[in-house]
């Protein structure tokens, strides 16, 4: 994937130079792109997702829970949630509005707040409509401690975008609408969604429904896979 991205960046630079008259041709276009092999990222199991939420609720007086829930139930990227402020979250309209300077792609995105997420965000109370960051001070360290204490993914380590992958996989499993999911994820085409984000291994219609309806139910009530 790094070779693929490297060629793409180089081609963009050469195209810019070509338009400015700094070179005669884009030599990168003469080289076929290397085959892109996407690494399959396993979505969290239902038990793991709930275990992570409950750990976030239990530690640091629950101040990390909203950010955790936004990544898990709205597919907000880690980079985006660090910049997100409470006044970008509108529980009345049911939308999280991400500004262009906060997103990975540089475009604005509006993500639906589903009931399971709304129930968690409502607990923030007085924080609504404020310009304060959703993530508390010293977020990175606290988030690492929460992941460590949750006990999930110990063997293979934490994957940066695993909550976004989990969101996408459970969303499609339960709602079955690829076009809607593509819009929520902010993808221009379905190709990235289908080739990189979706991993339905171990996800059933039952666990898909439970993911979206059993927000803070104790993980002990669920079967650990």
Predicted regions mapped to residue ranges:
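Basic, Lys/Arg- and aromatic-enriched nucleic-acid-binding interface segment
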Residues: 3-9, 19, 23-78, 82, ...
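C-terminal secondary-structure termini that scaffold catalytic or DNA-interacting sites
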Residues: 126-129, 209-225
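Short, basic (Lys/Arg/His-rich) helix/loop patches that form interaction surfaces
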Residues: 54-64, 74, 111, 125-133, ...
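Basic, alpha-helical nucleic-acid-contacting "clamp/cap" segments
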Residues: 51-59, 90-137, 149, 204
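Key DNA-contacting residues within the recognition helix of helix-turn-helix
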Residues: 4, 11, 82, 169, ...
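Catalytic-site neighborhood detector that most strongly recognizes the C-terminal catalytic loop/helix
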Residues: 98, 102-106, 118, 185-210
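Short, polar N-cap/turn motifs at the start of nucleic acid-interacting alpha helices
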Residues: 88-95, 157, 176-196, 218-225
